[in-house]
Amino acid sequence: QFTLTKGERYYFDLSGLSIPGDVNSYLPDTSLHYVPFVYTGTIDAYVLKPASNHVADSSYKASETSDLNAQYGYTYDHSLFMADDQIANNVSWVGLNNDGFIFGKSYTANEVEYTLRAPTVGSTFNTRISPSNNEWDQIEAKNPDYIKFNWNLNPEQGSWGQDNYYYNHVEFKVGRRKLAGNLIGFQENYSDGITYYRPVLEVLNPKTLGNDGLKVITLNLGGGKLGGSGDDIKIVVKNNGTYTAPSYEGLTRPDGNNDTYFWWLGSDGNSYIPGDAVSSDVITLTAKWEPLKYSVTLEPNGGVINNNNIIQYVYGQGATLPSASDMEKEYHTFGGWYTSSDFSGSPVTIIGSTDRG
């Protein structure tokens, strides 16, 4: 559905979603401003709806229909990003579901709409997992490396799925084991150390976006690091749209740099503060860990600035302009600094810390 590179890692800011559980300490950024996901491309798999909860055969019914109005879910082509690692631990299925993270939490990033949710993982395991057209298996059929295993975590780790699992007429919620390749059933309120949340991001409205609807932006960390690596990272934005200049939270400053300054230099030559709107035509942002300076030109209109002249200021600090005691012009009294040549508006005495240019 899209021209992104399958198997490539892209980063998403999930910091504002309040995902339940304990954040996986092995993520490159535990503040969740930079969470890695792997683009799987388009898969044909079933997805469940909330009505499937507590229905024994809901996965099978969804796996056998392409009717989007089907009660429990349906099978269709869709494009996914799979979390590159477990995101949260010690979290129950019901806790996630109560907050909308099992069947779909609306999420918009850089003008692209997604749903963040658990994948379907199958509901029974005899000699193989069924239904086989679940999302987990369809992703692994493309490339097993699209779902990585973290050896630093409990080897028995299971990732919550959407599906129900029944054993001796008792309902369990399904977790999927990467290492063992099988299913594991838990009570829906179980939240011990081997239950994890590893979501997918599904791109919504792919036909509206079109094949070229997504665009990749490269972030050059400029000597800084993310999770110990100084390599460039990539984010996904809407083509022919705008995106938000990313946060510096979660990034590590260059060695020996103890300042607090941060801004992005765009491939268009302009400077951007985190939170600024950036055109998607700006395909690279380079992190700058230094003061952002703006030039200042003071026109004394025939007078003389004897003291406290300024030619530039630092964003975040601002500056105080010369006052009457700093100015001199014979037979004249200083009336203040104005931003317009016709002296309209009120005089300016300072450049604010957030003033730009």
Residue spans of the language-model regions?
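GGW-centered surface loops in extracellular recognition modules
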Residues: 1-70, 74-81, 198-210
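Surface-exposed beta-strand edges and their flanking turn/coil or helix-capping segments
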Residues: 49-52, 94-97, 232-234, 311
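C-terminal, surface-exposed recognition/capping segments
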Residues: 1-2, 6-9, 37-39, 44, ...
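Secondary-structure capping and domain/repeat boundary segments
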Residues: 4-11, 16, 207-357
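Sterically constrained small-residue positions within well-ordered secondary structures
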Residues: 28, 73, 190, 276-278, ...
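Secondary-structure transition/turn motif
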Residues: 83-88, 277
